[in-house]
């Protein structure tokens, strides 16, 4: 993603909706920083889906639950993210409830999930960091 918005009007917005990409999720995707909270990680993962950054998705998915194929549907058009809640259970466990809106083939959809995260190393010898474990889909309200 470039650092300019439309017609050079300023920094490109972050897909997660929380600021400029370069200073929001971009710094995580480039490896300049690690997301400090489960919510920041979840936002960075949403942005990775929007941008097709499969490498970031794999790096931030817990090894015990990461599927072998993370290829995205190229026909998916992500429209926006709303974080409904972020709860810290203890120092190493958190949940984030969110709604992601998207279109496939012109039809609008919503992904409403309560995601679980752990703070640990993905590989032996790595520093601990937030990792996505799994989530429960929520029914539309």
From Swiss-Prot:
Gene3D superfamilies, A to Z: 3.10.450.50
Pfam name, any one: YchJ_M-like
Domain of life according to the entry: Bacteria
Coiled-coil positions: none
HAMAP family: UPF0225
Stated family: Belongs to the UPF0225 family.
NCBIfam families: PRK01842.1
UniProt-recorded name of the protein: UPF0225 protein Rmet_0111
Origin species: Cupriavidus metallidurans (strain ATCC 43123 / DSM 2839 / NBRC 102507 / CH34) (Ralstonia metallidurans)
Organism placement in taxonomy: Bacteria, Pseudomonadati, Pseudomonadota, Betaproteobacteria, Burkholderiales
């Amino acid at each position: 993603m470039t650092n300019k918005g439309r017609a050079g009007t300023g920094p490109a917005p972050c897909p997660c909706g929380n600021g400029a990409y370069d200073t929001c999720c971009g710094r995580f995707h480039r490896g300049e920083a690690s997301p400090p909270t489960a919510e920041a990680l979840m936002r960075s993962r949403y942005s990775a889906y929007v941008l097709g950054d499969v490498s970031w998705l794999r790096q931030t998915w817990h090894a015990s639950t990461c599927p072998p194929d993370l290829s995205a549907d190229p026909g998916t058009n992500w429209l926006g993210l709303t974080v409904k809640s972020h709860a810290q259970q203890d120092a190493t466990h958190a949940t984030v409830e969110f709604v992601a809106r998207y279109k496939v083939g012109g039809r609008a959809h919503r992904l409403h999930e309560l995601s679980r995260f752990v703070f640990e190393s993905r590989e032996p010898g790595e520093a601990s960091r937030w990792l996505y474990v799994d989530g429960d889909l929520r029914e539309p309200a």
